[in-house]
Amino acid sequence: MEKHGPPEHAAYPIPQADYQGSQGPYPGPQGPYPGPQGPYAGPQGPYPGPQGPYAGPQGPYPGPQPGYPVPPGSYAGGDPSGFPVQHQPAYNHPGGPGGTPWMQAPPPPLDCPPGLEYLTQIDQILVHQQIELLEVLTGFETNNKYEIKNSLGQRVYFAVEDTDCCTRNCCGASRPFTLRILDNMGREVMTLERPLRCSSCCFPCCLQEIEIQAPPGVPVGYVIQTWHPCLPKFTLQNEKRQDVLKVVGPCVVCSCCSDIDFELKSLDEESVVGKISKQWSGFVREAFTDADNFGIQFPLDLDVKMKAVMLGACFLIDFMFFERTGNEEQRSGVW
């Protein structure tokens, strides 16, 4: 009798005689899937959030979002990147550009006049005279203004000349003046007084000098011109008018595409301990303005009062040799 159905294949095993096929229909999973054990109740009670309401830092910062780590206690607001602010905004008094950062005030050491603590941690000062547009266009002499910076470009002081209009335009560069030096809060920390003196080497009895007061009204030193037929020389004195250091300049003070150095020397003039440099500012600035740039270098451990006296020497040198008023040409020599 012929067998019907699919042909047998050698690869498939022959079912046993009592093979009943599949054991009934596939029962599927053992009963319906129970799912989670009861409905999900969520967290046990409402999430309490941080312990107590977070007030956030002082200022417009709204505080962290839920789940965001709490900033450290010293956090005082930040920039968009979230980093703490390293420098607090400082008061920009009139006349000073607002974009220049101020140097942070260090702790004042003992026996340091108030306001001079900035000078205890630096060995270099940059003095930049500001360009006055009215003076450039009309030749009308205005009060000089200076930015005083450290080697990092941070502003340490701001200096403003306080002289009446008649004195500025009649006496020119030989004029007496009061220079007020302000800190980042606009407080006057130093006052420089230059009396009216003769500017010719033919009268050695009435030479130039400037008094440095810190705080205002309390002299801390003097810069006295020393007579010499060829060289510009100055003596730096302390508050008791005792000689401490000397400043010696070149024979011909000509700023032609190079810096001019006035060396800071010991009293015997044997060793050089620093210098005051008139820096070349470029042809256009040198030719059409009297806005000069200076660099002052001194030992880091120099007495802070003598550092202030060196700053006064820089201003006296500027007025004596590099100040131009009205239609006068900038001086190219010592006398």
From Swiss-Prot:
**To which species is this protein native?**
Rattus norvegicus (Rat)
State its cofactor. Answer: Ca(2+); Mg(2+); Zn(2+)
Q: Which GO terms describe its molecular function?
A: calcium ion binding; CD4 receptor binding; DNA binding; DNA-binding transcription activator activity, RNA polymerase II-specific; enzyme binding; epidermal growth factor receptor binding; lead ion binding; magnesium ion binding
Q: Please spell out the taxonomic lineage of the organism that makes this protein.
A: Eukaryota, Metazoa, Chordata, Craniata, Vertebrata
Lipidation (S-palmitoyl cysteine) occurs at: 201-202, 205-206
Q: Where is this motif: SH3-binding 1?
A: 64-72
Q: How does it sit in the membrane?
A: Single-pass type II membrane protein; Lipid-anchor
Q: Which residues carry this modification: Phosphothreonine?
A: 178
**InterPro entries given for it?**
Scramblase (IPR005552)
Give me the stretches of Pro residues compositional bias.
26-37, 59-72
Q: According to the lineage, what is the superkingdom?
A: Eukaryota
Keywords annotated in UniProt = Calcium, Cell membrane, Cytoplasm, DNA-binding, Hydrolase, Lipid transport, Lipoprotein, Membrane, Nuclease, Nucleus, Palmitate, Phosphoprotein, Repeat, SH3-binding, Transmembrane, Transmembrane helix, Transport
Cite the residue spans of the region called 7 X 7 AA tandem repeats of Q-G-P-Y-[AP]-G-P. 23-71
Protein name per its UniProtKB record: Phospholipid scramblase 1
Gene behind the chain: Plscr1
Per the entry, the cofactor note is:
Magnesium. Can also use zinc with lower efficiency.
Q: Does the keyword Oxidoreductase apply?
A: no
Region annotation (Proline-rich domain (PRD)) ranges = 1-101
Which GO terms of type biological process are on file? acute-phase response; apoptotic process; cellular response to cytokine stimulus; cellular response to lipopolysaccharide; defense response to virus; immune response; intrinsic apoptotic signaling pathway; myeloid cell differentiation
Q: Which residues carry this modification: Phosphotyrosine?
A: 91
According to its UniProt entry, what is the function of this protein?
Answer: Catalyzes calcium-induced ATP-independent rapid bidirectional and non-specific distribution of phospholipids (lipid scrambling or lipid flip-flop) between the inner and outer leaflet of the plasma membrane resulting in collapse of the phospholipid asymmetry which leads to phosphatidylserine externalization on the cell surface. Mediates calcium-dependent phosphatidylserine externalization and apoptosis in neurons via its association with TRPC5.
Q: Which residues lie on this side of the membrane: Extracellular?
A: 323-335
Q: Where in the cell is it found?
A: Cell membrane; Nucleus; Cytoplasm; Cytoplasm, Perinuclear region
A Pfam family of this chain? Scramblase
Chief localization? membrane
